[in-house]
Amino acid sequence: RGSVDYKDDDDKTISCTNPKQCYPHCKKETGYPNAKCMNRKCKCFGR
């Protein structure tokens, strides 16, 4: 399907203003290497 596997469990997501804040968090909490800052919350994804 090629859809991106987003992970944003509300208990694990953190607020952000910049995706750079999300990368270490995502790697630690989810193991996912990529991140975006959407609606001031980190979204973690695998590809």
From Swiss-Prot:
It is found in: Secreted. The record marks K36 as: Basic residue of the functional dyad. Expressed by the venom gland. Disulfide bonds join C16-C37, C22-C42, C26-C44. Keywords: Disulfide bond, Ion channel impairing toxin, Neurotoxin, Potassium channel impairing toxin, Secreted, Signal, Toxin, Voltage-gated potassium channel impairing toxin. The record marks F45 as: Aromatic residue of the functional dyad. Residues 1-12 form the signal peptide. The keyword Transmembrane does not apply. One of its GO terms (molecular function) is potassium channel regulator activity. GO terms for cellular component: extracellular region. Its main location: secreted. It holds the Pfam family Toxin_2. Potent inhibitor of the A-type voltage-gated potassium channels. Most potent inhibitor of Kv1.2/KCNA2 channels. Reversibly block the Shaker B potassium-channels (Kv1.1 sub-family). Has the structural arrangement of an alpha-helix connected to a beta-sheet by disulfide bonds (CSalpha/beta). Belongs to the short scorpion toxin superfamily. Potassium channel inhibitor family. Alpha-KTx 07 subfamily. This is Potassium channel toxin alpha-KTx 7.1. It comes from Pandinus imperator. The lineage of its organism: Eukaryota, Metazoa, Ecdysozoa, Arthropoda, Chelicerata. The gene is PTX-1.
